[in-house]
Amino acid sequence: MNATLETNQLRQLDQQHHLHPFTDFRDYAQNGGRIVSRAEHIYIFDSDGNKIQDAMSGLWCCSLGYSQDGIKQAVADQLMELPFYNNFFKCSNQPAVELASRLTSMAPAHFNKVFFTNSGSEANDTQIKFVHRYFQLLGKPEKRLIISRKNAYHGSTIAAGSLGGMSAMHEQTQGLNYIHHIEQPHWFELGGDMSSDEFGLWAANELAKKIDELGEDKVAAFIAEPIQGAGGVIIPPDTYWPAVQKILDERDILFISDEVI
């Protein structure tokens, strides 16, 4: 079978049976998509023979490239020894223990626990549970509201999609009513005549205003990407984060850093 025929058959099967996320299905039904067949170093190769630099690193998760022999061997060895076992009911395994220890050794001292998840969406769903349980244990169950930002991306589940600030995702399902959004710190789009430093303080004050509107006794956390990736790789002004941290500290509100890039 020649490569073109095989690619056409794969595209047809893909169109018939494979439901893709974040896809224009009308366009896909008419024109098909790309079949990625292999990868090497920082490049992917499609079934038409095109070599493409993978600037997205898979989906941000292959930043070490595709040709690390040590990683491949470690995966193969682990599949032979113990492909999977859960960590419920006080169970663990050597790789999980060693990885948790290594991660905490590289983090600031107060980051001393690791909870493993399968995706960013799952991680942020879990963050909501952690935040709510934290304030329940402190005797403040009324602190449940979470503030996020417009144009943010925090995942695609109902909870993570609600945390995100992309309106197209909110049109697909009803969001969670305890999640609220403020303006993003996008100086180039929203700064107007303000300097970068002035805009950073203005954007941080949007958080303070929202907390005052909702009631600091009801707001549990603020979630944000240090750099907004999917929103356009938006880097806040230097004045933004120190002002945000001060606002949160003064009001007993947690900060969830959704850091990917």
Predicted regions span which residues?
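A generic structural signal for well-ordered alpha-helical segments
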Residues: 14, 75, 247-248
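Active-site and channel-lining beta-strand-loop segments
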Residues: 33-55
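PLP-dependent aspartate aminotransferase-fold enzymes
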Residues: 101-221
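Glycine-rich loop-to-alpha-helix module at the N-terminal edge of alpha/beta enzyme cores
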Residues: 4-7, 51-140, 147
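Alpha-helical transmembrane segments of integral membrane proteins
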Residues: 228-230
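Catalytic PLP-binding core of fold-type I/II PLP enzymes
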Residues: 234-261
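Active-site-adjacent loop/helix segments that line or gate small-molecule/cofactor pockets in enzymes
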Residues: 2-39, 81, 95, 199, ...
